[in-house]
Amino acid sequence: MIRGVVDADVCLFAASTLLLLRGIIQARDAFAGLANDSIVSIALMMMIAAGLESSGALEFVPELVLGRSKREWVGQLRMHIAVASVSAVMNNTPLVAVMIPVVESWCRNNNHHPSRFMMPLSYSAILGGLCTIIGTSTNLIARGLAQQDDPKLKLPFVEVGIIGLPLTVAGGIYVVLFSPLLLRKRDTMMAAVVADPREYVVSVRVDARFAHIGRTIESAGLRHLRGLFLADLQRQDGATVPSPPPTTIILQGDKLTFAGDIQGMQHILSLPGLTPISSADLAADLEETVAGSPSSDRIMVEAVVSLSSPICNMTIRDSHFRSRYGAVVLRVHRNGERIAGGLGDIVVKGGDTMLLEAGPDFLQKYKHSTEWALAVDAFRVTLPRRDPLALFMSLGIFIALIVLNSMDVLPLSTTALVCLFAYLITGVLTVSQCRAAIPSSILLTVAGGFGVAKAMTVTGLAHRLAGSLLNVFSWMGRAGPVAAIYASTSLLTALLSNGAAVTLMYPIARDLAKQAGVSIKGPLYALMIGASSDFSTPIGYQTNLMVSGPGGYRFLDFTRFGLPLQFVAALITVPICVLYFEPRT
């Protein structure tokens, strides 16, 4: 898992299966996670978030709050308040996915640099999620594990907010004060495309549908294009005509390479019979035969490759990208910089940002896919029109869910199920959208993690590890147990994933609390905060990875700006957990 060869969900599920076969755990232990109330709640809340997203509610509220301030710090502060408030009551991944194009458009309209807002956007979503028990999936996983051990344990809706709210306030102040000093202005991929149009190149193949086969370039209307020029023509036999004269005859199978601005590119891609091949240097070619439907309804997509994508460590050519996704790669950025050379030879890595020319259904198919950390329309400048009735209905139903859950009238899974049913019968959400929103990776991680956690208990491994941690942190006195769990969980989250970190660290936190003679709540809340407070790497938390491309960030940008915030989080979390949640038992 640490080396990234196999995903955390696969590792934990395989480990749980082996433990079951060896007789170390029972079948009920191996599958306890799938039947746990909190884990069912995660799946339901993900589907509810999809309903809020499809209705436009997630765009409506932040767009209203952001305003039109020309002062950067005002925009950052307003964004922090808006995003943290919404993230407190719903999963932060779909929220950030919706907010990225909203913030990009807002920055463009108000002359702000996106790199000063994208990382703060992720941090605001993370911090806001720490204010309630339903704010992040890791909170719900930890609650599920704790209540499985002690069904009488009460974890009120906003109790974790005793830590999360001060953290959120401190995070907002930190962003406003230190982003001008520590957060560099970076050129994003889309800014580079627009600012340097001569660098933007696309190649198309002439197929039988092109209406001007056998005619000259000039008579075909490809000579005096606005913001665009025909830089190269290559025949099927490999003969190349650089800067072809206007009298050159166009033949079926010709490869035409254009250079220019994005508006010109969109015009060329809209012509039936000109099928895109690739974009890069003039000699670059994916060396594959392309065929497809007319491109008039195709869109430009900005996408970030997830760490678990099946195309990771494969070249674009070997991944059969076009046939797999129905899309063509036009540009690839890594660590904030464009990868030059032939696109077909680029080895894909998790976190790469791609500009794609894709079919109109690409976003619908892959918006919630684990193959992509982010997929958004690259050139959407205005919010799509939404049905006002569906928007306010989705908000009203969701607010009712939050009120009922905060009053502890019904279990979260029950209120979430009622909310989801209301979304379905009112048409806010469809069954297919529900299926697409189910977080299979999280559920597999939890399903396997519950079994591994049980094995750590019955074998005594958790007890021994807890004793070792107590010895290492004994110099901190009463703060030792909480500091041990917070530090260990934060480290494990950076190496694995937050879901895996919670399931592996929970039995250690429980045994550590018993050995130290303190309440479970202190180490438990430290576990929740530690699993979600990875600010220093783009790969430690999903939303960090999502904003890395749109912000044009390099890896060390997260370390420079996020590591101090990581220490701030520790300095706030540990004392509060000790002073408020740890009376001696």
Swiss-Prot record:
Domain RCK C-terminal, by residue range, is: 189-274, 288-372
Gene3D superfamilies in the record: Regulator of K+ conductance, C-terminal domain
Q: What's any one GO cellular component for it?
A: membrane
GO BP annotations of the record are: potassium ion transport
Q: Does the keyword Membrane apply?
A: yes
Entry's InterPro entries? Cit_transptr-like_dom, DASS-Related_Transporters, Na/sul_symport_CS, RCK_C, RCK_C_sf
Repeat in keyword set: yes
PROSITE patterns in the record = NA_SULFATE, RCK_C
Any one Pfam family here would be: TrkA_C
| Transmembrane portions of the chain | 5-25, 30-50, 83-103, 117-137, 162-182, 389-409, 411-431, 442-462, 482-502, 561-581
Lineage: superkingdom = Eukaryota
Question: According to its UniProt record, where is this protein located?
Answer: Membrane
Q: How does it sit in the membrane?
A: Multi-pass membrane protein
Q: Which PANTHER family match?
A: BASIC AMINO ACID ANTIPORTER YFCC-RELATED (PTHR43652:SF2)
> What does this protein's UniProt record list under function?
Not known; mutations in SAC1 produces cells that cannot synthesize arylsulfatase and cannot take up sulfate as rapidly as wild-type cells. SAC1 is necessary for cells to survive sulfur deprivation.
Q: Which family does it belong to?
A: Belongs to the CitM (TC 2.A.11) transporter family.
The protein here is known as Putative sulfur deprivation response regulator
Question: Which species?
Answer: Chlamydomonas reinhardtii
Query: What is the primary gene name for this protein?
Result: SAC1
